[in-house]
C-alpha cells in the first residue's frame, strides 16, 4: 500500500507540513504539488486549508486549481477549510466580501456560522464525533472518539453527512460525496484516532 502516489494539493494558503508529517509517519511518501499531471495521476489526494473561504477560493482560482480538483476521480480528503470548500457556498466572507462565497460545489452542503448558543466561537479543542455505521473512513475508530477542532463555520447535518459533532447544535464533522471526502476536524492533530482515520483514507 505504501507504493501509492499520495499528493497534498498545494493551495498556497494551507499549512501542509503537519498533514505531510502525519502521512509520512504512516510509511507513505507524499508530494506537495499543484501540477495537473501530478494531481491527476495521484492515488490519494489531500486538500487542506486555513484562513477564510473567500481567501482560499481566490487562491484556488489564481492557481488554476478549481477545475483541476473537480476532475479528480480518485479519493480526495478535504481537511477543515478544505472540507468546507467541497460545499456549494460559504457564509465565511472574510472582511471585505458582502455576499456568499461560491465554493467547489462537490457536495450539497452550505457552510454557515455555527449556532452555539452560549458557547464561545471559535469551536476550539477536543470534541467527540459520532460516525454513521459502516463508513470505511471511520473503520476501527470507536463511537464517540475525540478529534481536534478549530473553526467557527460548518456544514449543517444533511444527506452528505457521514459523521456529526455537537457544539451548541449538531453540525457535520465529516462528509462524503462520491470519491470526495471531508473532515471538519484536524486528523493530523487528533492523536491515534486521527492517524487511524488518515490510514483508513489511504487504504480506501
From Swiss-Prot:
Keyword Transit peptide: no
Location of the protein in the cell: Cytoplasm
This protein's record includes keyword Amino-acid biosynthesis: yes
Domain Glutamine amidotransferase type-1 span(s) in chain numbering: 5-204
Key words of the record: Amino-acid biosynthesis, Cytoplasm, Glutamine amidotransferase, Histidine biosynthesis, Hydrolase, Lyase
Reaction catalysis annotation: 5-[(5-phospho-1-deoxy-D-ribulos-1-ylimino)methylamino]-1-(5-phospho-beta-D-ribosyl)imidazole-4-carboxamide + L-glutamine = D-erythro-1-(imidazol-4-yl)glycerol 3-phosphate + 5-amino-1-(5-phospho-beta-D-ribosyl)imidazole-4-carboxamide + L-glutamate + H(+); L-glutamine + H2O = L-glutamate + NH4(+)
Annotated EC: 4.3.2.10, 3.5.1.2
Molecular function in Gene Ontology: glutaminase activity; imidazoleglycerol-phosphate synthase activity; lyase activity
Pathway info: Amino-acid biosynthesis; L-histidine biosynthesis; L-histidine from 5-phospho-alpha-D-ribose 1-diphosphate: step 5/9
GO biological processes: L-histidine biosynthetic process
One cellular component (GO) term of this entry: cytoplasm
Active site: 80, 186, 188
Pfam families according to UniProt: GATase
Functional note: IGPS catalyzes the conversion of PRFAR and glutamine to IGP, AICAR and glutamate. The HisH subunit provides the glutamine amidotransferase activity that produces the ammonia necessary to HisF for the synthesis of IGP and AICAR.
Subunit structure: Heterodimer of HisH and HisF.
NCBIfam families per UniProt: IMP_synth_hisH (TIGR01855)
Record protein name field: Imidazole glycerol phosphate synthase subunit HisH 1
Amino acid at each position: 500500500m505504501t507504493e501509492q502516489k499520495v499528493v497534498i494539493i498545494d493551495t498556497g494558503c494551507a499549512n501542509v507540513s503537519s498533514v505531510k508529517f502525519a502521512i509520512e509517519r504512516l510509511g507513505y511518501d507524499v508530494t506537495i504539488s499543484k501540477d495537473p499531471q501530478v494531481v491527476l495521476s495521484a492515488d490519494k489526494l489531500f486538500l487542506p486549508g486555513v484562513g477564510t473561504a473567500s481567501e482560499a477560493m481566490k487562491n484556488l482560482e489564481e492557481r488554476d486549481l478549481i477545475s483541476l480538483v473537480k476532475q479528480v476521480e480518485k479519493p480526495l480528503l478535504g481537511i477543515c477549510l478544505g472540507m468546507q470548500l467541497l460545499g456549494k457556498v460559504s457564509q465565511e466572507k472574510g472582511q471585505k466580501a458582502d455576499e456568499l462565497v461560491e465554493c467547489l460545489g462537490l457536495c450539497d452542503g452550505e457552510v454557515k456560522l455555527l449556532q452555539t448558543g452560549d458557547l464561545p466561537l471559535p469551536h476550539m479543542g477536543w470534541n467527540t464525533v459520532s460516525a454513521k455505521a459502516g463508513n470505511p473512513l471511520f473503520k476501527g475508530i470507536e463511537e464517540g472518539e475525540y478529534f481536534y477542532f478549530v473553526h467557527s463555520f460548518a456544514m449543517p447535518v444533511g444527506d452528505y453527512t457521514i459523521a456529526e459533532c455537537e457544539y451548541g447544535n449538531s453540525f457535520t464533522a465529516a462528509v462524503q460525496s462520491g470519491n470526495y471526502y471531508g473532515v471538519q476536524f484536524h486528523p493530523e492533530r487528533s492523536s491515534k484516532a486521527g492517524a487511524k482515520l488518515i490510514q483508513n483514507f489511504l487504504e480506501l
